């Protein structure tokens, strides 16, 4: 989802449209046998190579992939981030703690109603959280009604997809990322296409908010101030009182 959005923003810049500068950082690793995850990482790295070498992108867009993302690497990333991308499809991901670490360090969150995002949004207030995407029940309804990804693709999405299909990020090789493209437009098990328009629109809200520095900083401080619920002290006390019955 995020990589596809970067491609769409790349196209906007190439077409001369206004763009609030971004440095987009990806981090992760793939299990040895997870072919699609490896292909996505290759795709991200290829996007970075094309974008970062394009003079039209200077001062506007940069893409970075951090390989073998780890706790140690996270110690440098969490304090440096302005925006936390918590974009799993609603109902598809177990709750983690990365979003809490970003929040405690002042990053604002763009995310779906999935995992601990729900608690973060409840704590900081909906006005201090960039919400996008379908809910878990809406995702279930899509599948019950025979979800077909192409029904959710607008002109912006098709332009990005066609650029990928044409080999722009694979040195002219039109087959390299065809498994990824075919998966998105014919299968899309994580409903990327269903969420893409909403995600792109909310990213515009992120950019506009960033330009209002006082508003952004106020939102950041409110996120930090309301992050205490996720502290280990609170969690341990809660366990002692409600489960273990000790002091």
What are these regions (language model features)?
Residues 22-24, 83, 109:
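Hydrophobic beta-strand segments of well-ordered beta-sheets in folded domains
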